[in-house]
Each structure stands twice: as C-alpha cells, then as structure tokens.
C-alpha cells in the first residue's frame, strides 16, 4: 500500500482534531448547564397543612437557589440560598419555611392566601440558570363546617329532649293536681249531701 501524500495527512489530522475539539466543547457545555426536575407540578392542600414543594437539580458547583411566590395579591421573594449556607428568608415567610439542599422547600401551616404559583430559579455560578413552577391550591377544611353544624344539631336535640321531659313532668303534676282536686270535690260533695240528709 502506498503512503498518503503529506498534504492529505495534514487535512485528515486537522479534521480529526476539529472533531475531537467539538466533542470536548459539547461535553463541556453540557456539563455547565443546569437541569431541574419537578416531580409534582400541581399540589392540592387544605388549610393548616404542611406542604413540601419538591424539586431536584443538577449542575457543577454550588448554585444559588431562589423561590418566589406569585398570586392575585402580587409577587414576592420567599427565600434565597446556596446549599450548605444559611437561607435568606423574607419577613413574610419567617418561621414558615424550611429549605433543603436539593432545592426543595417546605411551607408550614398553609392558608388560602398561600394559593398561587411558586417559581424556583437555580442559577449556576457561571450564569446559566433554569426555572420551574409549582402551582399550589389551598382550600378550606369542609369537615370543620360540618362539625359546627353537628354541634348545633346536637345542642338543639338536647334542648328539645329537656323541653319534652319538662312537659312530661308538668303533665304528670297537672294530672295529679286535678285528681286531688276531684277527690276533694267528691269529698266535699259527699259531705254536703250528708249534711243535707242530717238537716232533713
């Protein structure tokens, strides 16, 4: 086999070098990106419940994680932190938020006003970022209303039972009183008849 001319060897070497450089650049760009996974994009909850807004991310280095809340009442920042450091929690959510190193947060004792959109932004130190949204619906606890109605009905039933018992007792007393009165009337009538007989 004849050796290739030196010009062809150079172009083949350059093209292989360019190919290797492109592969390395693609791998480098891929490793610098941020990926974010949200297992549950919509959460339904009831009042006073503790809610976990669960996410997972992957990136090189330590990112900055930020959660914001958006609803009919406006948009506000909830918390910002870097995993392994102390979180900067807003005043509106002090003592109501717990952060996790995987980017998740837990909201304690949610209310109807907590319904809305929760947006997480994960920003890598080189500037690339990724965001995701979780929708939270918080509804009133229906059984509390039913409990209130049940208590009122039980109270009314107890009052009705007491009234019926009082009516029964009053009826018995009235019956005894009438019986006594009839008996006295009978006695007085008998005495009158006897007196009339004696007078005659």
From Swiss-Prot:
It comes from the Eukaryota. Residues 29-147 are extracellular. The keyword Protease does not apply. Its main location: membrane. Residues 37-139 form the Ig-like C2-type domain. Residues 1-28 form the signal peptide. InterPro entries: CD2/SLAM_rcpt, Ig-like_dom_sf, Ig-like_fold, Ig_sub. N-glycosylated. The keyword GTP-binding does not apply. It is a single-pass type I membrane protein. GO terms for cellular component: axon; dendrite; membrane; plasma membrane. PANTHER family: SIGNALING LYMPHOCYTIC ACTIVATION MOLECULE, V-SET AND TRANSMEMBRANE DOMAIN-CONTAINING PROTEIN 5. Cell adhesion-like membrane protein of the central nervous system (CNS) which modulates both the position and complexity of central neurons by altering their membrane morphology and dynamics. Involved in the formation of neuronal dendrites and protrusions including dendritic filopodia. In synaptogenesis, regulates synapse formation by altering dendritic spine morphology and actin distribution. Promotes formation of unstable neuronal spines such as thin and branched types. Regulates neuronal morphogenesis and migration during cortical development in the brain. This is V-set and transmembrane domain-containing protein 5. The gene is VSTM5.
């Amino acid at each position: 086999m004849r050796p290739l001319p030196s010009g062809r060897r150079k172009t083949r070497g350059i093209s292989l070098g360019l190919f290797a450089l492109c592969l390395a650049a693609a791998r480098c760009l891929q490793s610098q990106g941020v990926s974010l996974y949200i297992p549950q994009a919509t959460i339904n909850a009831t009042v006073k419940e503790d809610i976990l807004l669960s996410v997972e991310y992957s990136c090189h280095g330590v990112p900055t994680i930020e959660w914001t809340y958006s609803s009919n009442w406006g948009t506000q920042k909830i918390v910002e932190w870097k995993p392994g450091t102390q979180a900067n929690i807003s005043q509106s959510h002090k003592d109501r938020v717990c952060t996790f190193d995987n980017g998740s947060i837990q909201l304690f004792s949610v209310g109807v006003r907590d319904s809305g959109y929760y947006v997480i932004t994960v920003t890598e130190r080189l500037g690339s970022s990724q965001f995701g949204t979780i929708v939270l619906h918080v509804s009133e606890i229906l059984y509390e209303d039913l409990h209130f109605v049940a208590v009122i009905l039980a109270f009314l039933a107890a009052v009705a039972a007491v009234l019926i018992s009082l009516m029964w007792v009053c009826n018995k007393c009235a019956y005894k009183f009438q019986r006594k009165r009839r008996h006295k009337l009978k006695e007085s009538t008998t005495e009158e008849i006897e007196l009339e007989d004696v007078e005659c």
